């Protein structure tokens, strides 16, 4: 390597050494240590450009990103109030589970593939295509004449939504300085909490007063406005482009890690199918479920092996070997799991134990949703101001553990102060830590690795919620049956299961009702124990992340290592 002349300096010249430390360029994190020349060496240490957005351009781009992710998040939860009418129109009660799982399956399975696309193509192009796919899926759902077409539309919408969240966070990286990224990322993450609040109200209004199809039609004009705003006001920076040196069709295809992508997609499909059918359609001891779980394990191992030997790996080994990334993934898995478990089963507690309607249960779940949304945005602003994210990770672990633990103590006659206060504690904790794994990835990784790291964090957060909600649901059903056999042995559990949470009061006699809701309450508090356990396990992730300070206002983009 050619040596450059260094200016003369004395060993005691502390001022010069500090200046040199700050000015010395860091090696490109995206550079392949195996010598792969296909990676663009112009990626640099950080996707920094001289054209960060401000004023009207930044406002329009952020509005477009927030609207896009609000729609994607809304699509995940809006079905709760519309499913009864949809299943009635299609005469397809047996397909209800697939209305959500088909969306989650493609959303989860294609997260890492989008991460690869964002490193190979201009971010604006990939994000726009993802949103167009989401819009097409929404249109198919809106015009669906039967249940199979509706399920297909949900799968297409999930395929598009997979690239929306991580893509929005990557666009933020290219739009604002490093010290502002946590603040603006918090605005995008906050859209998921806002959508959780709005979904039951919007879904209920459309279903009751217009038609459930407008739950999906609404995505078309709003999504179109968001796409237009991004197309006209955001320009992908040069760093997003990759120099193409491959010759031949297969060489070009190989850039996208086809074998790794195949193994990963198939493993996720096997896992999600097992979770969807296990405990409901078939018992977990059924040979079909066991085969799916075994295939998931084998395919996942194959994916990991490919990542270590393929120079075009979807997740480069250097990313996975990074201590902060590895423990950050554990943390994000736990954060995603505890939050989704609580926001899924709190409305069921209100419907099943307190005999409230779907809309009323959604309103009474606002304490956890609003406190979570507020604290996501607040934490983003505070991380931008201070540069520190680990204190918020620990605050999240402590508060979510306390909140989930208190929720496990709920009784049938719990006072309003208890269920409101417990939700607020859990919501504050979840909000403070919800995006911190993303902050970790954007601090310890640089260049195209930052893009991959962001996609990985989003993926494990979604995967945690998907797996643990399924596990919690199976625990709910199992414990409910056990409790009914103990408290009301003369009642057929199948009657209660078919009635659902909102139909218990009409399914049993007035004399049996107190015993049934007691059984329901005990079973539901067991699901809150799942949230408590994963909240506590989040401490493992927080403890393993290196104590680094990201950029704060007034800093350069280079993070300062405070302690290891």
Swiss-Prot record:
UniProt family annotation: Belongs to the major facilitator superfamily. TCR/Tet family.
Protein name per its UniProtKB record: Efflux pump hmp6
Alphabetical UniProt keywords: Cell membrane, Glycoprotein, Membrane, Transmembrane, Transmembrane helix, Transport
Chief location: membrane
Positions glycosylated per UniProt: 312, 322
Keyword Cell membrane: yes
Localization per record: Cell membrane
GO molecular function annotations of the record: transmembrane transporter activity
Protein task: Efflux pump that might be required for efficient secretion of hypothemycin or other secondary metabolies produced by the hypothemycin gene cluster.
Origin organism lineage: Eukaryota, Fungi, Dikarya, Ascomycota, Pezizomycotina
GO CC terms in record: plasma membrane
Annotated membrane topology: Multi-pass membrane protein
Segments of this protein annotated with the region Disordered: 1-46
Biased segments, Basic and acidic residues type: 1-25
CDD domains: MFS_Azr1_MDR_like (cd17502)
